[in-house]
Amino acid sequence: MSDALGYEGKQVVMTGAATGMGAAAAELLVELGAEVFALDIADVKAPVHRFLRTDMKNRESIDSAIAELPEEIDVLFNCAGVPHPPASAFDTMMINFVGLRHLPDALLPRVRQGGAVSSIASTAGMAWKTNLDRVRGFLALETFEAGETWLKDDPELGADAYGFSKQCIIVYTQELAGELAKREVRITCISPSPTDTVFMTKLMGEMPKEAIEPFTPSNGRFAASLEMGRVLVLLGSDLAGFISGVNIPVDFGYCAEVAMGQRDNLMNIS
């Protein structure tokens, strides 16, 4: 394949590379010549440069992986995530955000000038503006342990742990953009609409089909993992060299329809 994306020989770190969007992106990155260091609790099938078994809700596990990663990194992809239910509210927040944030907070000093960070949020997190004070309050807890303690003591966590975790990713992405720009490092996230993954299969096993169908785009289908993986790979590439600080809905126009009043705003998108 052409090297227009600029991945040949690049050192790329990715969480959540075993399944779904992360697996699709990992396959593409290997094809594009990147050296991929994959972190996941499950086996990774893509022929990555190195696989590090990692539990993203366990600080010791994450720190052990960090110690094995290269001293210079070109791109970091945060793709690990679980649905709630069936995962507990606590585990959902720990994996989807607390562990997710711990990794880039440790690795950002290693990201080269011109490098990039990209994470998977969700259209379920698009109500972040209406919950900004609470999100910022959580982000102000700068350590892994402080976040863990807050989550254990929060009686409201179970109501929407998944949505809150994705709101945190979106706000975290935007808050870091200015500081990282001084080093010419970019940071972005994507908000997928429902996607045909193992993740979605688990979610649909816990929720009635009627609860998920209203969030399907007007093209009438869920996205494929590869359709999301391609966007991630693009955002980390040289072709996206001036894109930073944005959350990009990858939803075939779902959020646009909500904004134009053409669909009910079921997720309080703002």
What are these regions (language model features)?
Residues S2-A4, S244-S270:
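Short C-terminal tail/terminal secondary-structure segment
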Residues G81-P86, A116-K182, P194-T195:
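Catalytic loop of short-chain dehydrogenase/reductase
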Residues Q11, A18-T19:
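Conserved glycine-rich cofactor-binding loop
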Residues A181, R186, I243-G245:
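Short, small/polar-rich loop/turn modules that mediate ligand/substrate recognition or access, typified
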Residues P109, G178-E179, G241:
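Alpha-helical segment proximal to the catalytic Tyr-Lys
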Residues H102, Y162, Q167-I170, C189, ...:
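C-terminal helical subdomain
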Residues A46-E60:
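Rossmann-fold cofactor-recognition segment
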